[in-house]
C-alpha cells in the first residue's frame, strides 16, 4: 500500500501538493506513482519563471519501463525546481514526498480546495 500523507493535497493524475507558509505550493509525484513507474532514471524539470495552466504538462519522469508526464496541479508560475531530484532521480523512489520536483506560486490559492484530500486520493490509488 502506498504512503499517502494526510497533510497534502492530491490530483487524480498522481501529483501531490503542499501549501507553504509563503503562499507557494511544493509539487511532486506520489508514492503510488513512483511505485507504478519503478526505478526512475531521468527527471525533466520545468523552467523557473515559466507559467503553466492547470492540467498542462510541466515535467517528465522516466523509469526503466515507462515515461510519464507530470501535470501542473493548478495554474501558476514556477518559482523553484529541485535540481537534486533531476541529478539523482532515484531519490524520488526513495522518498517521493521529500524529493519534490518544483515549487510554484498559484494564480489562485483557492484552487487547492478543489484537489483531493488523502482519503479521496487513496481511493483513486487503490482503484488504479
UniProtKB/Swiss-Prot annotation:
State its role: The glycine cleavage system catalyzes the degradation of glycine. The H protein shuttles the methylamine group of glycine from the P protein to the T protein.
Q: What's the source species for this entry?
A: Dechloromonas aromatica (strain RCB)
Per UniProt, what is the name of the gene that codes for the protein in this document?
gcvH
One Pfam family per UniProt: GCV_H
Which cofactor does this sequence's record say it needs?
Answer: (R)-lipoate
List the NCBIfam families. Answer: gcvH, PRK01202.1
- In this chain the Lipoyl-binding domain maps to 24-105
Subunit note: The glycine cleavage system is composed of four proteins: P, T, L and H.
Name the record gives this protein: Glycine cleavage system H protein
Presence of the UniProt keyword Ribonucleoprotein in the record = no
